[in-house]
Design a protein with these regions (language model features):
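Extended, well-ordered alpha-helical scaffold segments
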Residues: 138, 145, 212-231, 329-349, ...
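Solvent-exposed beta-strand/loop surfaces of large extracellular or lumenal domains
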Residues: 659-684, 704-710
Length: 963
């Protein structure tokens, strides 16, 4: 039974009077039973939250960590031989953050295996509204960010976005500004920023109201589309021998493909012949970049590739967004035509030149070029963004049946069976994968379900979303560390050891790539269209939007975040001033003009209010205008019909955090006696007219969002102050992550609170009613002030060690379960590495795991095996906790073999120290070398840097320093 199902069994009555004596520890007295019907051949869908009732009668949702997360356990659960239909079994777990045992409060889920598959919705039940139909009102942080973003988008040089296209198609670049960042002429991801730029100007045009800004955006959209078509037409070449156009399938025959080079010198030759790219090809880099991945060429900007289809997707998405949001039909039609022709180029190449082979060894699977099973499983090189989503969208937008079918086929050519198949069975194959490489693929799978109606695609998307919520998400809604998903339920370990080098006590505090938040919000929105009565989707969107997304834009000047500030004493790493600066500069250029996108969902007879924010909705189909009058963040909202009238049902979300005082009144009359958090309240269909008012009161509740794993003593004590292993959590106020400051060590980042949070008080209003700081909410504890994460930008701490001052001591029981699970995982990695080492011909080129991390894991693995061999009677709890934590840390800090490790930075770091800080006397060559070296340092720290990048940076510095 999932969260939605069991909430229907409970009606939260008026909450009882709370015990106020701080000396009485509030304990969990009851957890609502968890019973799950699990289709045969799948692992059970377990809830990420359970409804708990405390000893004083208070109830709320709490996070739960299930014990079946080891991959072998899930594979066994999905084995129909072991668990046939009709069988039953239990899965244990713990309510995290509870002090009744070392692992939390024990819970069990009763699993019943049933015949058949998951119940999947046949079609979308609801839709969002166009950006132009929902406006954000008032003068607040939402409108401040939106207006800042529109001003900046209008200022971007359209010629800079066109430079690479003209260069790639042999057109004059005189008068065009060279692009920069990740779209610079010597970066193979070029085109990604131009794609985001097109999406950004299209969205900005949809929401802008200033006539001068609209005119600028109109001019730039028109020029972008016209010049892209001019470039694309260079590929419209008729071949007399073939008696048809020269197509994608004709480009780079296999013999040529096998010898194709990926150097910049080679690309300089390729761009001299755009007529060879194939009919319809449009990209900011020659078509050879897309072909090279068919030979399984690795991520290497200098010699091979950098995610060829990732940038193609961004450009397709930008053209589709122009066709969707712009109001000039001629330009919209042309944008759609450009996208369609490129989509058919992709179909042509995939259909005729690629295939899927899953059996055999990797060497056998790669013997012939074009095996998509291998192509899309490559780290970063095989990153395709949302290709399947854009191609599926195109198939919906074109009218020709043959083109529709081809585009949908092309969309499913970007399926990743190695990733998808386990997820379709609810087996967590998310672990250790590149985060933003895979989230957009899930969005694409769900989009293709809209047309192909194969439950496989819906199920893998739903399963992915559920797994991410419980196992990988941080309090702000973000995921990922060093751009990677780590092991399940290791968020705190990953955060507290990020980029940590031997001998250091401070981890690198920036994790949670903003692209991931952007895409998870998008996935949540799309899933909500199929099941809009499930409030969990909007609970997540609210969390991520109100914290990481809104907080990722510098309110003082246009800058966005790549990684986000999450760890100790973190300062938001603002930068990314253009869509081409980085991947997150691209998604950042889109984020801040569409906050209202998920505020409302509708169908012919129902309107769902998902977000409480000051907005005006023009529901054209019903002929009504609905205004939501509130501050932001909102604890009270009044929804009014201001124009028109109509019959419809209204559904209002009760947020998961709304545990006290939630109220809904229609024209002054209360609609229910109680309201269940994380559900929708249905106001049955009535005739709504001007003058009707729906009032929602939703006082923010104080609660702790716990990390799934404890902060181990060895990590907490790295600065020399001995600390015990403890739970770690984020202080929440309603949907807001509340950040403190002044904590540079884990000793300083400790909250002494009672189990009711009664010593945490609400601060007084700052009196600011307009602008970025309007309606600022604060909490206070022991003289410390906590402010919303979206507002606090520098020296912030979000996660604190939680010391419950009224907790009772607990019984200690030696349990090797977690350590044995880690040892099994370590053994799997060791076996994979040894298998690769034994290969006479190294396919793939790189080992599964990078050497330094692998060596660390081996050493700690041996220590852990010795501890287990002693037996439970001869091991102390401290020894067990310490060894488990060290092995967990060793496993979680391992990197794939093709990526550089922190140890690989030693020479580069030494050169950068000697180069010192550049000043006015520093040569331009050295300044550029220092800048590049620092960028490479950041990439390696973040987890995406390669050895060739370090080699290039060292070479640049040595040359500039004349060594």
């Amino acid at each position: 039974m999932d969260l939605k199902q069991f909430t229907l069994l409970i009606g939260v009555a008026s909450l009882p009077s709370l015990v106020t004596a701080a000396t009485v520890y509030r304990t969990i007295s009851k957890v609502t039973a968890v019973a799950v019907d699990c289709p045969e051949g799948t692992a059970p869908r377990l809830p990420n939250l359970v409804w708990v009732t405390y000893s004083d009668g208070y109830s709320e949702y709490r996070q739960v960590r299930w014990a079946n997360s080891p991959l072998a356990d899930e594979q066994a659960e999905a084995d129909a031989q072991k668990h046939p239909a009709g069988s039953q079994y239990e899965v244990g777990g713990f309510v995290i953050g509870d002090e009744s045992t070392d692992n939390g409060y024990p819970v069990k889920a009763q699993i019943k295996v049933v015949a058949g598959g998951y119940q999947t919705p046949e079609k979308e039940v609801a839709h969002t509204f166009s950006l132009a139909d929902v406006s954000i009102d008032g003068d607040n942080r939402l409108t401040h960010n939106r207006d800042e973003a529109i001003r900046e988008i209008c200022s971007w040089d359209v010629t800079q976005q066109l430079y690479n296209y003209r260069d790639t198609y042999g057109l004059s670049t005189e008068g065009y500004t060279k692009s920069d960042g990740w779209d610079s002429p010597d970066t193979k991801l070029k085109g990604h920023g131009s794609g985001h730029y097109m999406s950004a100007i299209a969205q900005a045009y949809a929401v802008a109201t200033n006539p001068e800004q609209k005119a600028i955006l109109r001019k730039n959209i028109t020029r972008m589309v016209n010049e892209l078509r001019e470039c694309q037409e260079k590929t419209f070449v008729y071949n007399k021998e073939l008696k048809r156009n020269w197509e994608a399938r004709d480009f780079a025959p296999e013999a040529e493909l096998r010898e194709m080079k990926g150097t910049w010198a080679a690309f300089d030759e390729y761009k001299k012949h755009p007529e060879l790219y194939g009919y319809g090809y449009i990209n900011a880099i020659p078509a050879q970049h897309c072909a090279l991945i068919e030979m399984y060429r690795a991520y290497n900007n200098s010699d091979w590739v950098w995610a060829p289809y990732y940038s193609v997707h961004k450009q397709l998405a930008g053209l589709i967004d122009i066709a969707t949001y712009f109001d000039d039909k001629k330009i919209c039609d042309k944008a759609l035509l450009i996208a369609k022709d490129m989509g058919l180029w992709v179909w042509n190449r995939m259909h005729y030149r690629t295939y899927v082979k899953q059996d055999g060894t990797q060497d056998e699977r790669r013997a012939k070029p074009g095996n998509r099973y291998e192509m899309w499983d490559m780290y970063i090189a095989g990153e395709v963004g949302g290709m399947s989503e854009s191609l599926a969208r195109l198939s919906e937008m074109v009218s020709n049946p043959d083109e529709k079918a081809k585009l949908l086929e092309a969309a499913n050519c970007f399926d990743a069976p190695k990733f998808y198949d386990p997820l379709s069975k609810n087996i967590d194959d998310i672990r250790t994968r590149h985060a933003n490489q895979h989230i957009p693929m899930i969005i694409g799978a769900l989009r293709s379900y809209k047309s192909n109606q194969k439950p496989y695609y819906y199920n893998l998307a739903e399963n992915f979303w559920r797994l991410v919520q419980g196992r990988y998400m941080y309090a702000m809604g973000g995921v990922g560390n060093g751009e990677m998903f780590r092991q399940p339920y290791t968020q705190i370990l990953s955060m507290a050891t990020n980029g940590l080098q031997e001998g250091e006590s401070q981890a690198y505090p920036d994790i949670n790539e903003t692209c991931c938040a952007y895409n998870l919000v998008k996935l949540s929105k799309d899933l909500n269209c199929y099941n809009p009565d499930n409030a969990q989707y909007l609970d997540y969107i609210e969390r991520t939007l109100y914290n990481q997304i809104i907080g990722s834009l510098n309110p003082d000047q246009y800058q966005t975040c790549y990684q986000y500030a999450v760890g100790l004493n973190a300062t938001k790493p603002f930068g990314n001033e253009t869509p081409q600066s980085t991947c997150c500069g691209g998604t950042g250029s889109e984020n801040h003009t569409k906050y209202q996108q998920s505020a409302y969902f509708a169908n012919d007879h129902t309107l769902w209010v998902g977000l409480y924010m000051p907005t005006t909705l023009h529901w054209k189909e019903k002929g009504v205008t609905i205004k939501q009058d509130c501050l932001w963040p909102a604890q009270h909202s009044a929804i009014k019909i201001t124009e028109g009238e109509g019959n419809f049902t209204l559904k209002l979300r009760v947020p998961y955090w709304a545990t006290q005082g939630f109220s809904i009144k229609v024209n002054g009359k209360e609609v229910a006696k109680s309201y269940q958090p994380s559900t929708y309240v249905e106001l049955e269909q009535k005739h709504w007219k001007v003058g009707d008012v729906v009032e929602i009161d939703m006082p923010f509740s104080k609660h702790i969002e716990y990390g799934a794993d404890k902060l181990s003593s060895d990590v907490a004590s790295l600065d020399g102050t001995p600390l015990k292993t403890s739970w770690v959590g984020t202080l929440m106020y309603g949907p807001l992550v509340m950040a403190g400051t002044g904590a540079q060590t884990w000793n300083q980042a400790t909250l002494n609170i009672d189990s009711r949070l009664s010593n945490i008080t609400v601060g007084e209003s700052n009196g600011v009613t307009t602008g970025a700081g309007a309606n600022l909410l604060t909490l206070k504890l022991d003289g410390k002030e906590f402010q919303p994460d979206y507002y606090r930008n520098a020296n912030s701490t979000h996660y604190y060690r939680i010391n419950l001052t009224d907790a009772k001591s607990k019984k200690v029981k030696i349990d090797f379960t977690e350590l044995n699970s880690l040892l099994n995982l370590a053994a799997e990695r060791k076996a994979d590495q040894e298998k690769w080492n034994a290969l006479s011909q190294k396919v793939p080129e790189y080992a599964p795991w990078a050497p330094f991390g692998y060596e660390r894991m081996q050493k700690v693995m041996a220590q852990a095996q010795e501890l287990v061999a002693k037996g439970k009677k001869k091991v102390t709890q401290d020894e067990l906790e310490g060894t488990t934590a060290i092995l967990n840390r060793a496993i979680n800090t391992m990197r794939p073999g093709n990526l550089a490790e922190m140890e690989d930075l030693r020479e580069l770091s030494g050169l950068l120290r000697r180069a010192s800080c550049p000043d006015d006397n520093t040569s331009d060559e050295l300044k550029e070398a220092i800048s590049y070296g620092r960028m490479v340092q950041k990439y390696v720290t973040d987890g995406s840097g390669t050895h060739n990048m370090i080699h290039a940076a060292v070479g640049k510095l040595k040359k500039a320093m004349k060594q």
